[in-house]
């Protein structure tokens, strides 16, 4: 099982954690939402929960809960800039499609 970050995502997360001044890393998860069924969740982590799995890539700890791991295995978190827009992009090999608005995905 693995979760990875692109170089641009690692730099961005590192900057966010440095600006925040504390934190173990970044939690990556999924929740039920949207028209396709699931949406990604990103949040800072200060403490680990029972059942969390910790991945480390490019010096950044990515924490995933046990229920989300099956949907996220093999995912690469990227940070992209497209014109005036910028944001995190999830390159998830388990995703079989997204809704039209791009807010949710299915497997």
UniProtKB/Swiss-Prot annotation:
Gene Ontology terms: biological process: iron-sulfur cluster assembly
GO cellular component: cytosol
Residues involved in Fe cation binding: 35, 99, 101
Domain of life: Bacteria
Any Pfam family the entry gives: Fe-S_biosyn
Keyword Lyase: no
Cofactor note: Binds 2 iron ions per dimer. The dimer may bind additional iron ions.
Name this polypeptide is given: Iron-binding protein IscA
Organism, as annotated: Pectobacterium carotovorum subsp. carotovorum (strain PC1)
UniProt gene name: iscA
């Amino acid at each position: 099982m693995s979760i990875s970050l692109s170089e641009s995502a690692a730099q961005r997360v590192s900057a966010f954690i440095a600006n925040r001044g504390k934190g173990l890393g970044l939690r990556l998860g999924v929740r039920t939402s949207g028209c396709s069924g699931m949406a990604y969740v990103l949040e800072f982590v200060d403490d680990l929960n029972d059942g969390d799995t910790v991945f480390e890539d490019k010096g950044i700890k990515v924490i995933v809960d046990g229920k989300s791991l099956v949907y996220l295995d093999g995912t690469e978190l990227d940070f992209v800039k497209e014109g005036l827009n910028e944001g995190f992009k999830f390159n998830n090999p388990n995703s079989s499609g997204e809704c039209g608005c791009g807010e949710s995905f299915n497997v």
